[in-house]
Amino acid sequence: MIITLRGTPGDDSWCTRLRTEVSDDLLALGAPGLAVNVRDATVGDSLMTLTTLDPPVVGLVAIWTQQSYGPHVTGALDRLRGECDRVDAYLVTESVPLPPPATAPGARTPGFANVALLRRPADLDAETWFARWHVDHTPVAIATQSTFGYVQNAVVRPLTSGAPVVDAIVEELFPLAATRDLHVFFGAADDADLGDRMNRMVASTSAFGANRCVDTVPTSRYVMRSPFAAEVSQ
């Protein structure tokens, strides 16, 4: 499941507290996996920021758990509600076409994680939308960008009352310089290459509506507890 945290951006002390004190409290609940993403000063000036929600998303918490309505989830929501203006949770299914690099527990993942909240257009049925997103778009995204980690979360349903409509939450890892340089973001050799890569991406995202009504949140990513033991650095 993924929890979105919404509030006023720019509070680095909040970001630090979320990935330390608050994360310790969440770890104590015993969930098999926990990751925290924060929109901190390291990524705050990113060019890759799009916002439709008010207040905007300033952090996300991912919890791997066997029970979406069990104490791992209810305890986390209770703890997080006092930390920001709005807390919403979504049950998701995770696909990982490009696994992120393993990190030590609590260490910052290299680069930055660009998190996108996607909505399925009303004129696309679910089967077509998933096919265009997963089957058609995935190889284009990997080929045209400098991505070194790619996680796709399809939303099954919201877990909190009144949660904004979100149909997918995508996390892509990029070099940190990509927050300020489109050439780095797209892995382009020159202006002509950049134009070609951008055109291919626009055509691909337009096919499933990811070019509109989307939020993109630049974040620093911290895996506090990996649910996959083989991924944990020794």
Regions found by a protein language model. Give the residues of each.
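Macromolecular interaction modules
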Residues: 1-234
